[in-house]
Amino acid sequence: FNIMAADQFSSLKRPSGAQDAIFADRNKVTKTVDMQCRRLDTLLPELVAQHGFARPFLKMDTQGHDLSVCEGAGDAIGRMLGVQTELGVRPIYEGGAGYRAMIDWLEARDFAPSAFFANNKGHFPLLVEMDGIFVNRALVRD
């Protein structure tokens, strides 16, 4: 895990060489640490057993790693009532999925956009990233 100069940038991914100059001093690796990662499809049954929920909502903020989290959900993604994800518009992390790829991935699994909103007003007028909320068409009534 990459610990960045500014902790809000810490990520499994390394900083993008194409990141905007305004991030360069804050989004640089100062230390790496080992950590355990688990796939959501193996973790979700444990969480359901522990907390007893029936309609999970997946909220992610994994600093460029959201698509990998969704892929790690396997078939369990279809049990999610909805998903909230960060959608990268400008590159911050190497290998981070852009907003179009993330939207396409979710729509291919029958998740419909419900809302998009900028998650950081400090970079107006150029959008860096936004949050997107998607609902599972199979589980939500029109």
Residue ranges and their predicted role:
Residues F1-R38:
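Glycine-rich adenosyl-binding loop in Rossmann-like folds that engage adenosine-containing cofactors
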